[in-house]
Amino acid sequence: MRSNLPLNALRAFEASARHLSFTRAALELCVTQAAVSQQVRILEDRLNRVLFKRLPRGLEMTDEAQALFAVLTDAFGQIDTIFRQFEGGEYREVLTVAAVGTFAVGWLLPRIEQFRQAHPFVELRLRTNNNVVNLAAEGLDFAIRFGNGLWPATHNEMLFEAPLTVLCTPETAQRLRRPADLLQENLLRSYRVDEWDNWFAAAGVTAERINGAVFDSSRLMVETVIHTGGAALVPAVMFARELAAGQLVRPFDIEIQMGYWLTHLKSKPMTPAMEIFRDWIVKMA
């Protein structure tokens, strides 16, 4: 029989570790900051270990705390999954997938109904993000990411290639005779700061510092280009409609190889719902 586990203390610790703040943990748990701090002290006394360094601007986990947090994140995630599977009085497999917004809008959402019709017992919960995810902390089964597939601690399977290329309006393209002419235009950037540098290097152009606005969405960049001009370095495959309509053109053929990837934690066993979704999306891609 298990010894008495300090469940309230573990819950307070997990929330504090996730937020790195007793105050934000207290707001989440609907208790006082003092109550959270006391529960963490109880856990520290129980383990005979210091779990947090109390700093002026927040908390910092010790090595012991990081090890405990990893275990609790997984355990609480599994408990939450089981509860969600029985919501509504019937059993359903819950599958939580995060996707970059451009992929979600441009590829996944138009196909979601096909998945639901084929697999009605799988409740797909879709989140969007800007490609920065923490699968364990966010309780994700899969994340669909854009890049080169070199992410640690995850199994990464390419869905399809989506090379980065320059898109602009036909009016802007008339001013572009060679790649270096782009340096006279407003170059919109993603948070991946080296993309334009890599593109110009592939074009044989030495670029000065690029200071265009930074976006966390390729789709938002493209909408900005259409309405205000400039040029964006984006996966053209996701903007076939705008290209076909003549709203956008590709002034140059130079590309940076990238792709969309289905990723999941190597440490997370595949559930039946995960296997179903993986087989479906790979086939559809």
Swiss-Prot record:
Keyword Cell membrane: no
Domain HTH lysR-type span(s) in chain numbering: 5-62
Subcellular location as annotated: Cytoplasm
Residues annotated to bind DNA: 22-41
Single biological process term from Gene Ontology: DNA-templated transcription
InterPro entries in UniProt: LysR_subst-bd, Tscrpt_reg_HTH_LysR, WH-like_DNA-bd_sf, WH_DNA-bd_sf
Gene3D superfamilies from the UniProt entry: Periplasmic binding protein-like II, Winged helix-like DNA-binding domain superfamily/Winged helix DNA-binding domain
GO molecular-function terms, A-Z: DNA-binding transcription factor activity; sequence-specific DNA binding
An annotated GO cellular component: cytoplasm
Keyword annotations from UniProtKB, A to Z: Activator, Cytoplasm, DNA-binding, Transcription, Transcription regulation
Domain of life: Bacteria
Cysteine pairings via disulfide bonds: none
Functional description taken from the UniProt entry: This protein is a positive regulator of gene expression of beta-lactamase (AmpC).
Annotated family: Belongs to the LysR transcriptional regulatory family.
Name by which UniProt lists this protein: HTH-type transcriptional activator AmpR
Taxonomic source organism: Citrobacter koseri
Lineage: Bacteria, Pseudomonadati, Pseudomonadota, Gammaproteobacteria, Enterobacterales
